[in-house]
């Protein structure tokens, strides 16, 4: 096995062998910097010599610390990291992984990426979460997203993944939060979930109400002494009733969906929300779909961010709400149930929620109702995309 293959073992898939050299060259544009991937090889300079890798990492952190647009906490963290990196370079000491930390960290959150790594045209690195967040913020502020280091334009088409850095980061050692032993980052998740003897686990009698949480190596002793298996039926009934309530709510939702699927008139279509701006002095972002036809009627969907609050880009919590509008005329009230789900080619996580409304010529639009996205991270994924693609189901209720 070659040295390059050994360095990449256990990391994320990097495609065919011919694709690796393209990932190693971090810069992708004219005048691009050598970048962190090349800097990772700076260990060849040997201990005691201030190699280019350490100097580049220290300079990068110093730039982040001096950025007037950066939040105070980030500037403080960057300053501390820059001092540590500069001291390590000056002394020519410290473990390789400690020196690589400042070189391979994300330029936004200053932490080592946990998954995909993106780079701007000048080679500055961003973890997937920060990259998506920058694009979402730019969409909310109606600005072009830029790299926080060099201010060059960034987008999904301009930026690319850096497979060399992803593989290098996956091989760096990381400490298990339970047993405090060190493992390659690519193996740490499996160790914490399946192998660590100190990982937090639950009693097998949790189904009958046992609340015990503890280290895995104590599980056998606890289960042997657990009092729940010896409880009477009456004692267990109260516990089981509470646990069944959440299950009943979930089953009620799915039973409602199955009931709707038995209706005579059902329609569904793929809808594409496109971003627009209001005509206000301070414009606000909103989304609207082109007109579409379902159940022989013409409809439009609209959506807004954080209920159209003034500065949603300043909020860490992001939500989307939507309304359904009937654009065609009806001769009688049109009673419908509807729900939005993810499209066939998207990976956004949306919980199904059924909404109900009676459409008339005088009342032809619903109130804004929440789009049941799992969390703000999923919302940022939608905002970062050029368009939002979902699937709408409409059920006409006939009396």
From Swiss-Prot:
- InterPro entries, from UniProt? Sina-like_RING (IPR049548), ZFTRAF1 (IPR039338), Znf_RING (IPR001841), Znf_RING/FYVE/PHD (IPR013083), Znf_TRAF (IPR001293)
Q: Does the keyword Protein biosynthesis apply?
A: no
Its predominant location is cytoplasm
List GO terms (cellular component aspect). nucleus; perinuclear region of cytoplasm
Point out which parts of the chain are RING-type zinc fingers, as ranges: 106-151
Which regions are flagged for Gly residues bias?
Answer: 1-13
Which PROSITE patterns does this chain map to? Answer: ZF_RING_2, ZF_TRAF
Chain segments annotated as transmembrane: none
Zinc fingers (TRAF-type): which spans? 152-210
Subcellular localization: Cytoplasm; Cytoplasm, Perinuclear region
Q: Where is this region: Disordered?
A: 1-20
Q: Which CDD domains match?
A: CYHR1_C, RING-HC_CYHR1
- Name the keywords, alphabetized: Cytoplasm, Metal-binding, Zinc, Zinc-finger
What does the subunit section of this Swiss-Prot or TrEMBL entry state? Interacts with LGALS3.
Q: What is this protein called?
A: Zinc finger TRAF-type-containing protein 1
Question: Which organism's genome codes for this protein?
Answer: Rattus norvegicus (Rat)
